[in-house]
Amino acid sequence: MFIYCSFFCFRYGGKYMQKQFYPVIGTEKALPFYIIGIGVSCWQFPVSRPEGYDYPQLFVCLEGEGEVTVDGKTVKIMPDSIFYIPPHCPHEYRATTHSWYLDWVCFDGKQALELLKEWDLNKFHVFLNCGAERMHKLFDSAYYTIKSDKAYGNYYASAQLYDMLLEYRKLSDDKFPYKSRVNSEAVAKVMKYTEENYSKPIKLADM
């Protein structure tokens, strides 16, 4: 069983279709990573959590501007930015423009926090102008994966969630995960083509 809402944000004058999904968690609790809730292209209303939130949260800023306050420090969030808020961390976030559209995911799992702690990433982070397009695609894909398969969607999305966390780590490593991923994918395609066609004359244009 799944609970979700999907509606056009005419009320707020937005242009996106707001997509949010909350799967009912069952046997997924045995997974190392699983999604608690996910939103794609969502108009963001003001949020204040003096006690924090029970789960880690990862966000992608798509359009508009906002600000996040953690530990008394306020950070401006602009388009093409990503930020992470750890569980039980008091925080606030709000729009500073008429509309502020975010992707968001909250998650859990036996290995989720352990992995982030091992990577030294279970703390509030903001990455500005970081090439967030690939991360947005991962959010979008995970949303439809969960929504389209009631039996195993969150199992498949578990792998996509890990990919999100890996992108988050790459942000911390070099600040340019999207560019590095594009280059890696391009090299992988060339290698695959070369191996499959090694016995044939290969033209540069074919690659």
Specify the residue positions occupied by each region the protein language model found.
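Juxtamembrane segments at transmembrane-helix boundaries
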Residues: 48, 115, 142-145
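Short, Lys/Arg-enriched, Trp-marked, Pro/Gly-tolerant hinge/linker segments that flank
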Residues: 123-133, 146-206
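Generic protein-terminus/edge-of-domain signal
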Residues: 1-81, 89, 95-97, 119-126
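Residues that scaffold the ATP/ADP-binding catalytic core of kinase and kinase-like folds
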Residues: 69, 114-116, 193
